[in-house]
Amino acid sequence: MKAELCQFCLRSGILCSKCRAKLERGEVTRLDLEIARLLVSIEDKYPLLQDVYFHGAVEADNILAILVRRGDANKILSYGGKIIRFLEDKTGKSIRILEYNTNERKFLEDLFSPLSILTINKIWLPDGTVETRVILKGRKKSSLNVNAMREIAKRVRGITLRVEFAD
C-alpha cells in the first residue's frame, strides 16, 4: 500500500524524522497513521492492497471515511467485503470508502451509498455562501447518519450539504 508515510514507519510503528515532521505539521493525523498501519498489516493476505494509494481518513460520529486514489475503492471493496469487516472490527466504526480527487457527484454517490441520488443542486444564499442540496431516493433510513455525512463532506471537500429525501 502506498501512503503519505513511508513503508518502514507503517510496518515498524516507529516514525522516522520525515514522517514525524509530517505528523507535527498536520499533513498526516494520528487516525491516518492508525488506519494505514491496519491496511499494511493485511497487505500480505489481500495482495490487491499493495496497489492502493491511501490519502487519509476522516471520522465523524461513528463513521470512518477512508480516502483512496481514484479507481482504488473497488480494490478495497473486493474480497467479499472482508477488508471492510476487518477494519470495522478493529476500529468499532462503520466504514465508508471514498475516492479522492473525483468529481462532486461521484463523491456524493460514494458517500450516500447504497442510497440513490435523484438530484444534486447548488443553492446560492444571500450571504454569498453556497450549499449543495442532495435529494436521495426513498424514505429517511434510520441506518443513515445524515449529520455524520454532512460533517465528512465538509471536512473532505469543503461542501456544505442540505440533504432531503423523496419517493
Task: Name each region found by the language model.
Residues 1-167:
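RNA-contacting regions in translation and RNA-metabolism proteins
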